[in-house]
Amino acid sequence: MNILVVESQEKLAEAGYKLIENVVKSKGNPTLGMATGSSPLGIYAEIRKNKLDTSHVTTVNLDEYVNLPHEDKNSYHYFMKEQLFDHLPFKATYVPNGMANDLEEECNRYEGILAANPVDLQILGIGENGHIGFNEPGTPFHSRTHIVELTESTRQANRRFFEKEEDVPTHAITMGIGSIMKAKQILLVAMGPKKAEAVKELLQGEYSEACPATVLQRHPNVTVIADQEALSLCSEAIADEHRQVFTISDLLSDSRVGETAN
């Protein structure tokens, strides 16, 4: 696992963009796994600013709320259109359909999409309770795309995006942890003190379904971009053990970048 320590959101965005640019420019028809929420906003802004050629890129999104219309400003369909899809051309874009009449069938359909479009680089944030995607604590590490009931802590974390508390969805459709782990490369971004406990568990916690992010300890190609606040609870020894690269140039020249996961 590589750790890249940054001083600001701007530096995080620049570093994340460089990783994505490297994949997009080095592969013929890459697939990017996209995340939503506040964590990747700066990265998406960099993609827009640099007018990255994404005409050959396929995207697959991690998750979507259930029973939230696609045109709702808080849906992840809307988020992706606002951040990227209305600004740049893509070969194909996929977001789970939380409005599907048969949600179990939608989960199966989405797994088929993932099988047909293996992810070259998956972007992840990390929840305060260690969730990745909407995979809450206790989710089996072998899980595939599924419907999840959101925990109260996750709903409260997303409350700020909705006018009223009762408007916050109670369920979501999400790529499973097993689905996420199939990505060839994973980029996890974390900023601020609220993420410190989760990042500590990721780096030095026990490999356990009680903290979904700890599954990444077993992935062969993970890069964590974080600031000092997000790393503030980690022991220096643990941080140094994982801090194998120090600059984005070092990271891009590292022979493991782009390796296929087992």
From Swiss-Prot:
GO biological process: carbohydrate metabolic process; glucosamine catabolic process; N-acetylglucosamine catabolic process; N-acetylneuraminate catabolic process
Entries under InterPro entries matching the protein: Glc/Gal-6P_isomerase, Glucosamine6P_isomerase, Glucosamine6P_isomerase_CS, NagB/RpiA_transferase-like
CDD domains (alphabetical): GlcN6P_deaminase (cd01399)
Swiss-Prot/TrEMBL keywords: Carbohydrate metabolism, Hydrolase
SUPFAM superfamilies, per database record: NagB/RpiA/CoA transferase-like
Cysteines paired by S-S bonds: none
PANTHER family per the UniProt record, alphabetical: GLUCOSAMINE-6-PHOSPHATE ISOMERASE (PTHR11280:SF5)
Annotated family: Belongs to the glucosamine/galactosamine-6-phosphate isomerase family. NagB subfamily.
Name of the protein in its database record: Glucosamine-6-phosphate deaminase
